[in-house]
Amino acid sequence: MVRFSTLAVFAALSSCSAFTINNHAIRQRAQFARLNMATTATPPSTKPLIDDDVVHEPPPLAPLTIWGDDIENIVDIQQKYKATTKYTFPATIECGELGIASDDEDAQLAYITENAMAIKTKMQENGAVVLRGFDLMKNQPGFQKFYSGLGMKVCLDPLHSVSARPTVDGKANSPVYEAVNKESRKNFFIGMHNEFVGTRAPRAAAFVCFKAAETGGEFLIADGRQIFLDLNPDVLDRLYKRNIRYSVMELPFFDFIDNVPEFAQEPLKGVIKGLASAAINAKVDFSVDLRWGEGGYDGARMLQARAPSQPPIVRHPVTGEPTWFCNVHSHSSQLRKDREEIYGAERFEDGASQINKSDMFYGDDGSIDDADLRHMDEVTMKNVQFIKMSEGDVVLLDNYKCLHGRNVFDGTRKHGVAWFEGWEGEEEIKSSLYSEALP
């Protein structure tokens, strides 16, 4: 998406011979175009892949996000749950405690298959299940046997329409993706978030460790239901009444506009914005609103792309419980700047990573107070659990109840993730867990 929209803008600019742009600006645009082409991966194919005479069909798209009905009297609902509810998060299954040898992969797969409904019910009740000590999941084929034995239904990465997350085995249409293992991102603390892009969100995910980092690199999880309960009622009320929206992309490469005659700057900005908007909205399956700003990168002019307004709390589609479904911890530029003081700069150094910089606002585009941002950060971090995974360990999580993230690390880290559109027996689980008497 980014490469297409940016190059379209530059192509349009090059045809505007009425505007005088100095050679430095032209070189800057050309350099960025080459950089973006080099650093932006080609989206994965949606055609079947033929490998060793076996046709691999691509998984289906991630399902549409289930926003549900509005929650009336959100603060009253919070107080009722706070008075009556105590969550256990996560559930844990230790292979050794089952009486199964760590290297007996056949017995491990048999256990997973025979207890699939119980494990999936734990995922729904507890929000996440941590499985430890299973040799079965130490490699990709075994990991795929694991989630197939559970009856999980794989889907494409929700980023599919806008970029390409690398796959673990490097093959197109592979269902197991890299989980942000790049050495260049080791100083980047990945804030807590639910996985969704635009209109699509997986129902569940399984994160697996194929190789643990020498230092750090813990997988982070937090219970969205507990975050909802722990929020200050006034902050909760403000957020829910005004909704939220994300800035999902920034194009900070338009300094050259300052070198255009003043009378032509506004018309040129209109042309750029119109071309970029048309290109981006033709690529993604959600509406993107572009707006001009300054100061994102060393005072540079930028185009900021904002997604539609959405609620920060939703009712869980299976159990009906209210849960925090908001990525402020990972998307807020202010919170990321605060973390830079602890972990160092995020290293937004190249074209692709700069474009991927994000932020969050109220749904009416108002700025969120620093005090409210820091309160949300404190509540989130209070609920974060650092899961140090060893080879073969898996965290099976419900994407609506469980937020996830990743700690900084040193060394070589090889974690993978599979996304799921649903699972076998979902309606049966829903009938046993959903209560019409929920507040």
Language model features with spans:
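Active-site environment of non-heme Fe oxygenases that use a 2-His-1-carboxylate facial triad
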Residues: 43-111, 116-118, 122-125, 183-191, ...
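A gly/proline- and charged-residue-enriched helix-loop-helix capping module
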Residues: 155-189, 194
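N-terminal chloroplast transit peptides
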Residues: 1-25
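N-terminal mitochondrial targeting presequences
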Residues: 18, 33-44
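Basic polycationic patches enriched in arginine
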Residues: 3, 27-29, 34
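Short, conserved acidic/polar surface loops in the N-terminal third of protein domains
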Residues: 142-144, 169-176, 200-203, 217-220
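Membrane helical hairpin/interfacial module
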Residues: 126, 132-163
